């Protein structure tokens, strides 16, 4: 019984030793794995760093200091003749923006305390009160966004443009004003 217990105790160790058995040959020997690359490596390109005579760190530092840098100026465009200048049509970019002020009215709902008294007993209750606040608001308007909005409006509500050109704007003025800002 004692021998069986000792055998079972040492069994995992014996199994583990068998897994890590050292073979004299690696699983992928170099001579088998890389032999077809031998003809592709040119021996003239091979550089053995061990053949170089070792230099002291001071000599290496001095050789690094002797390296000169050559500064090459960047090419500058030659100025064109006055007749050759062509201006390209540019579309408004993201920098073509302006701040625009407009009157805006905001409606707020607040709870205002309201004092109510009955004979000599007073109590407070909250009453909902609507406050109209007239302000001057500021928005940033960019030209490229206005062009996109105008294109979308023209595509989506083409009848507004047709009616405006033909002079019949009043017949569709309400729908055009809601969608595109009027005729």
Curated annotation (Swiss-Prot):
The modification Pyrrolidone carboxylic acid is found at residue 17. Pfam families: MAGP (PF05507). The keyword Secreted applies. Residues 1-16 form the signal peptide. Belongs to the MFAP family. Residues 52-92 are annotated as: Disordered. Disulfide bonds join 153-183, 160-176, 169-180. Residues 59-70 have a biased composition (Low complexity). GO terms for cellular component: collagen-containing extracellular matrix; extracellular region; microfibril. The gene is Mfap2. This is Microfibrillar-associated protein 2. It comes from Mus musculus (Mouse). Forms intermolecular disulfide bonds either with other MAGP-1 molecules or with other components of the microfibrils. May form transglutaminase cross-links.
């Amino acid at each position: 019984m004692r021998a069986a217990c000792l055998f079972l105790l040492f069994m995992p160790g014996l199994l583990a030793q068998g897994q890590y058995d050292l073979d004299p040959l690696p699983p992928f020997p170099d001579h088998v794995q890389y032999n077809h690359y031998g003809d592709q490596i040119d021996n003239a390109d091979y550089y053995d760093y061990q053949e170089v005579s070792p230099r002291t760190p001071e000599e290496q530092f001095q050789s690094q200091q002797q390296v000169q840098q050559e500064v090459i100026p960047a090419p500058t465009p030659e100025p064109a003749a006055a007749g050759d200048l062509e201006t390209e049509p540019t579309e408004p970019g993201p920098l073509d923006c302006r701040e625009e002020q407009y009157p805006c009215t905001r409606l707020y709902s607040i709870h205002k305390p309201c004092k109510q008294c009955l004979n000599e007993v007073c109590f407070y209750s909250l009453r909902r009160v609507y406050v109209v606040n007239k302000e001057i608001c500021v928005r940033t308007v960019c030209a490229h966004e206005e062009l996109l909005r105008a294109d979308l409006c023209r595509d989506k509500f083409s009848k507004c443009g047709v009616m405006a050109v033909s002079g019949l704007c009043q017949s569709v003025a309400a729908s055009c004003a809601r969608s595109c800002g009027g005729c």
